Amino acid sequence: MSSTWLAPAKINLFLHINNKREDGYHNLQTIFQMLDYYDELKFSITNGGVIKRINGNEDVEQSQDLIVKAAKVLQEYTGTTLGANLSIVKNIPIGGGLGGGSSDAATTLVALNQLWDTKLTQPQLMKLGLNLGADVPVFIFAKSAWAEGIGEILSPIKMPNYYYLVVFINKHTSTKEIFSHYALTMSKPQGKIAKFSELINTHNDCLQAAIALEAEIGVALKHLNTCANHISQVRMSGTGSCVFNEFLTEKDALAAAKKVPKKWMSFVTRAINTSPIHSWAVAKR
């Protein structure tokens, strides 16, 4: 028997880089907004301890695939003798700043913790996930969140369920290159916000570095600025390369999507405040 689970995308409503730490990482502040847009993962439990990806992500070596890595991390930590066959349907753009790989890893940890009956708590899973990537914990946390530290210090925040037009320019940006780029800016830490109405500064400190590395990001932002009825500043998510704007209605977002140049990928989605990750498989066995 197999079970199917969803892995949601996220956007960063702002991203402020505060300083560089001694360990090479950067302290930051951001809001992770969960989206109703998903990769789809399927898990079949096996005996014998073998973990194998049997479908999807063909361009990624199994040993480098985050879903395989996540499964092995959980297996090694818990000592389970069970294995799993893993399949994935990728919808979230790779290298777009939407957290797809991190979300896939998080879903793998949560799903196999249930399916293997390894009984780890959410905090334990989040700690394991942090070893796989700084964004993995928020997807295990499973709520839109105010984040600090390297993104692992999380507080839930309830945001409006706006519609978003997300554009991927079909080019990837390197997080490592952006964080070492001369155009990376820094922002002073701000007080934690408790509600959306307090969100004033939507600046992304990675934006100018990303545009310096990939000028088409700037072109896409200019295009989104021409869209009718968007309600806030157009923005880049994370370290790019996806950009987005915000709408009150799905109708307005879909109308804007029709005008996106065909050379780019785009989709319309809606904000969600809670991810279905901890309950999804119950209805999808």
From Swiss-Prot:
GO-annotated biological processes: isopentenyl diphosphate biosynthetic process, methylerythritol 4-phosphate pathway; terpenoid biosynthetic process
TM region(s), chain numbering: none
InterPro entries given in the database record: GHMP_kinase_C_sf, GHMP_kinase_N_dom, IspE, Ribosomal_Su5_D2-typ_SF, Ribsml_uS5_D2-typ_fold_subgr
EC number from the UniProt entry: 2.7.1.148
Domain of life: Bacteria
Protein family according to the UniProt entry: Belongs to the GHMP kinase family. IspE subfamily.
SUPFAM superfamilies assigned: GHMP Kinase, C-terminal domain, Ribosomal protein S5 domain 2-like
NCBIfam families: ispE
Example of a GO MF term: 4-(cytidine 5'-diphospho)-2-C-methyl-D-erythritol kinase activity
Reactions catalysed according to its record: 4-CDP-2-C-methyl-D-erythritol + ATP = 4-CDP-2-C-methyl-D-erythritol 2-phosphate + ADP + H(+)
Active site, UniProt feature: 10, 135
Pfam families named in the record: GHMP_kinases_N (PF00288)
Binding annotation for ATP: 93-103
Provenance organism: Ruthia magnifica subsp. Calyptogena magnifica
Pathway membership, UniProt: Isoprenoid biosynthesis; isopentenyl diphosphate biosynthesis via DXP pathway; isopentenyl diphosphate from 1-deoxy-D-xylulose 5-phosphate: step 3/6
Name listed for the protein in its UniProt record: 4-diphosphocytidyl-2-C-methyl-D-erythritol kinase
Gene3D superfamilies: 3.30.230.10, GHMP kinase, C-terminal domain
Keywords, alphabetical: ATP-binding, Isoprene biosynthesis, Kinase, Nucleotide-binding, Transferase
Protein purpose: Catalyzes the phosphorylation of the position 2 hydroxy group of 4-diphosphocytidyl-2C-methyl-D-erythritol.
